[in-house]
Amino acid sequence: MREIIHLQTGQCGNQVGCKFWETISGEHGIDQTGKYVGTSDNQLERVNVYYNEASSKKYVPRAVLIDLEPGTMDAVRQGPFGDLFRPDNFVFGQSGAGNNWAKGHYTEGAELIDSVMDVVRKEAESSDCLQGFQITHSLGGGTGAGMGTLLLSKIREDFPDRMICTFSVVPSPKVSDTVVEPYNATLSIHQLVENADETFCIDNEALYDICFRTLKMSNPGYGDLNHLVSLVMSGVTTCLRFPGQLNADLRKLAVNMIPFPRLHFFVVGSAPLIAIGTQKFKTYSVSELTQQMFDSKNMMTACDPRKGRYLTVAAMFRGKISMKDVDEQMSMVQSKNSTLFVEWIPSNVKTAVCDIAPTGLEMSATFVGNTTSIQELFKRISDQFTVMFRRKAFLHWYTGEGMDEMEFSEAESNMNDLLSEYQQYQDATVEDAEEFLVN
């Protein structure tokens, strides 16, 4: 089977990751102890993608849980799904990274990385035909950002031909919990550009907006935000886990989504959006799902796709859906909003359809877009970075761990290059496209 090894680093990564395991365990009929209690053969047909089957008919996630302090790990162990994970796969330090990227990447993280890689190799060896890795982390802190990107480069070294996709929680302007977020995020993006194959950008501000505006919650907590992220993670991987009429895997997704290797940062969305624990009263049609899916209010990334242009889009539908409906809706969206799609990629939309709907719904859709408007997100971080870096504010925390200012300048210029690449392709027309080909 095409296995995927899941890695979660830092507090945010571990909380998002645990929610993801809750969601897909529910879909596969696996209870909190790893026993199968489902009702349909489809649930077990490809359960091996994410689970190892242990001797006692127990299904164990192919997950490695990593943090530089024991607190989050203890919380996971005591949580409802604490017994699901393999005890050896918890790898943690004692000191913490204190929101310092350099600690996660160069000092504390570097001390722990070998034990993490041992566990990763063990998981890879127990796989039949490893497809790749997925990492959940945040870019604003120390462990998820610093150690998460160190892990990324180590995996790239050891498994050069496997796909690596990251679900990265990007710092957002209105919801900031750390002053040095712009530094940590810029240094991380510098790494992601070089080492990740696909990065799904998720942003707390957009998630809060969805909770307030769409789900009408009065005070959403991180649990609610993580639930939304887990919907997208489960949607993106549906085709790998269940039989479908039109399948996608990580590599197919990458081939269809990434026209230029550096531009692999995606906005994501999900439809219909339903809060935890609420009952659904409405059945949706394919056209309603498509409309919702392309609606900027449903995006889990704080940038407005209407301000940029889509290079490519992938849409994953789930449920008993006719392919004809899907194709019609997709071509309608493209012709109605033709200005939002670049015209030098003739068929920008890749669709996948999986027959098994998520728990409690008749049909759902997951949206992944490669849009040039994501530069808004990078621009915000870059501006905040520049303001602080010009004054060399807080730099001593990083140089004290052995970093050089040079590395900051490199990360800054890499970020600026990325911005201008997105801008270049946003402005490009078919006539320019001929010039690209000549170059």
Curated annotation (Swiss-Prot):
Annotated Mg(2+) binding sites: 69
Alphabetic keyword roster: Cytoplasm, Cytoskeleton, GTP-binding, Magnesium, Metal-binding, Microtubule, Nucleotide-binding
GO MF annotations in UniProt: GTP binding; GTPase activity; metal ion binding; structural constituent of cytoskeleton
KW Cell wall biogenesis/degradation (keyword) present: no
Gene Ontology cellular component terms for the protein in this record: cytoplasm; microtubule
UniProt-annotated location(s): Cytoplasm, Cytoskeleton
SMART domains: Tubulin, Tubulin_C
Superkingdom, natural source: Eukaryota
Keyword Iron-sulfur: no
PROSITE patterns to which the protein is assigned, alphabetical: TUBULIN, TUBULIN_B_AUTOREG
Any Pfam family hit: Tubulin_C
One of the GO biological process terms: microtubule-based process
Cofactor: Mg(2+)
Chain residues that bind GTP: 11, 69, 138, 142-144, 204, 226
Protein task: Tubulin is the major constituent of microtubules, a cylinder consisting of laterally associated linear protofilaments composed of alpha- and beta-tubulin heterodimers. Microtubules grow by the addition of GTP-tubulin dimers to the microtubule end, where a stabilizing cap forms. Below the cap, tubulin dimers are in GDP-bound state, owing to GTPase activity of alpha-tubulin.
Subunit note: Dimer of alpha and beta chains. A typical microtubule is a hollow water-filled tube with an outer diameter of 25 nm and an inner diameter of 15 nM. Alpha-beta heterodimers associate head-to-tail to form protofilaments running lengthwise along the microtubule wall with the beta-tubulin subunit facing the microtubule plus end conferring a structural polarity. Microtubules usually have 13 protofilaments but different protofilament numbers can be found in some organisms and specialized cells.
Entry similarity comment: Belongs to the tubulin family.
Name used for this protein in its record: Tubulin beta chain
